Every structure is written in C-alpha cells, then in structure tokens.
Amino acid sequence: MGSNEQIHRDKLIIDTDPGIDDSMTILMAFRAPTVEIIGLTTIFGNTTTKNATQNALLLCERAGHPEVPVAEGSAEPLKGGEPRVADFVHGSDGLGNLFLPAPTSKKVDENAAEFMVNKVSQFPGEVSILALGPLTNVALAIKRDPSFASKVKKIVVLGGAFFAAGNVSPAAEANIYGDPEAADIVFTSGADVDVVGINITTQVCFTDEDLLELRNSKGKHAQFLCDMCQFYRDWHAESDGFHGIFLHDPVSFTALVHPEYFTFKKGVVRVETQGICTGHTLMDQGLKKWNSENPWSGYKPISVAWTVDVPNVLAFVKELLMAP
C-alpha cells in the first residue's frame, strides 16, 4: 500500500457494560485497524451503570486512548426499577474483582442517548453502534430523535436466543431480559440492525488451553485480561461444568468487522415484554403468509446471525488479543 493511502476506518460507538468479555472487546476494538472508536457509552448489566462508566474510563486509559469520550447511560431499564446486575459472573467491580485504581479521566457531560444522537447527527450514515448490554440507551436515542434510526449506519446487538434456550430463563437471554421494552423498540425502529444471539456466541469459546496461550503470548493486554478472566472462567466451570469462557462480546464485534464469517437470516423480530416468557426474542422468518395482521406485521426485517465460522472468528480474536 502506498504511503499516502490510508485505511478507511469506520466510526464506532460501543455501548457497553464492562464486564470481562466487554473489556476484551474494547481492547480488541482499539487494536483493529479498520475501526475508529469515537466514544463509549455505558449501561447496567454485567455491573451497575456507575461501575461500567469507571471501567470504561479505565479501559480507555489502559488502551492508551484517554481522549476517547465516555458518556454515562441509564441506571435503570425504561420501565424503571432495579436493574438486573450479573456481578456473580463478572465480580462486584465488573472486572473479575481486580479492584483497580480509579481512572484519572472523567466522563463527558452528555448522557449516553444525547451523545449517540449528537454523533450520529454529526456524521449521518457513518456511525455504527456495537451494543453489548441491555438496549436502554439505544432505545432512548431512538425516542429522542425520530431520524436516528435512518441516520445510524448500523446497530450490531449482542442479545437474544433464536430458536434456542436463554441463559437467564428457558425463554430469555440476559441483555434482552435486562430491558425487553428497549429491545423491542430497537428491533422495530427501522434501523439497519444485526443481532448476534447466544445460539451463535456459545459456539465460540476460549478453553483453558486458549487462555494459557493468551497468557504466554506477547499480547499488549494479555496478562491483564487473563487475570480478569479467572473469575469469569471459574463461574463457567461452576455453573456450566465448562472449563473455559464464552466469547459473547468479541464474537459480536467480529460480526461487525467481519460479517463474512457469519450467515444471517432476515425477519421481523419482536420481544415479549410480560409474563413467563419476558425477554424472549421471536423472529418471523417469512416462511408462512399470515391470513391476518399480527404484532410482526408491517415492521422492517432485521438480520439475525444464523451460522458462524468458528475457526476464522477464533483466529481473528486471537490475532487482536495476542498482538504485542
């Protein structure tokens, strides 16, 4: 490549609840040559929103990018009430109980929804959002600006379980369950949405051998990540009998930058917001012509990840995490 040629970098906001696999993803994204992170926005999920903000600031500092703005998001789901926080998976600090020193940088004054709306309006058609937690902030941005859905380039969502069991109940996956109303707003907004569910992400994992390979690598953040992953790994062993970790968030980031490693099906997706199936994601694949209108009628289809090329995704994740 000629010295005057520049790699095109796609503008990206990561909406995140760091979180151990979020931390892996954020540090990966900062190393990815085709991505320009223009901000992090924070949400509850793996930890509280307040904790997530501190962790996002810490991760930007650790990545060598303290200038990247961090905007704090909603502390609770759209309908209010206590947020569901998975501290039993990610530790009480969200980072595997490493209890790191506080960041020196500060969050910006805008809240997450304001930040998203402003950036997407500043760069219409150029900004993608990688949503790694409950979708409250993205839904608030859509509600705040009726043109947001048409101006955002793409929203890639980690969430849902499609024709598969959930991970917080037989019906629901954690991010969607964390704010089902918000997820339904995002999925029916008319935006260009790709969803990567746990039926895909649980196919891609780091075994204990992979974690050891990472620890022994010259990766810039390898030791830090492996220290953090110990808590996450021990939870997997205890809860699932699995000796390793699922790479939910890194797989979703890979779907953003390497969609060719996945196949997608298009269909309208609705989210159940009440009853025993709260948080359930159900897609109309368009296989049947319905005789009458139903709650799926009239909405723009979104893309749901259907298959994944596991070896290529793993190779990409390792390449970024093990780069010196």
Swiss-Prot record:
GO biological process: purine nucleoside catabolic process
A cellular-component GO term for this protein: cytosol
EC number(s) stated in the UniProt entry for this protein: 3.2.2.3
SUPFAM superfamilies to which the protein is assigned, alphabetical: Nucleoside hydrolase
Catalytic activity: uridine + H2O = D-ribose + uracil
Keyword Metal-binding: no
Annotated signal sequence range: none
A Pfam family of this chain: IU_nuc_hydro
Active site: 248
Cellular compartment(s): Cytoplasm
Keyword Hydrolase included in the entry's annotation: yes
Keywords per UniProt: Cytoplasm, Glycosidase, Hydrolase
GO molecular function, one term: uridine nucleosidase activity
InterPro entries: Inosine/uridine_hydrolase_dom (IPR001910), IUNH (IPR023186), Ribo_hydro-like (IPR036452)
Cross-referenced PANTHER family: INOSINE-URIDINE PREFERRING NUCLEOSIDE HYDROLASE (PTHR12304), URIDINE NUCLEOSIDASE 1 (PTHR12304:SF1)
Family from the record: Belongs to the IUNH family.
Protein task: Involved in pyrimidine breakdown.
Name of the protein in question: Probable uridine nucleosidase 1
Annotated source species: Oryza sativa subsp. japonica
Classification lineage: Eukaryota, Viridiplantae, Streptophyta, Embryophyta, Tracheophyta
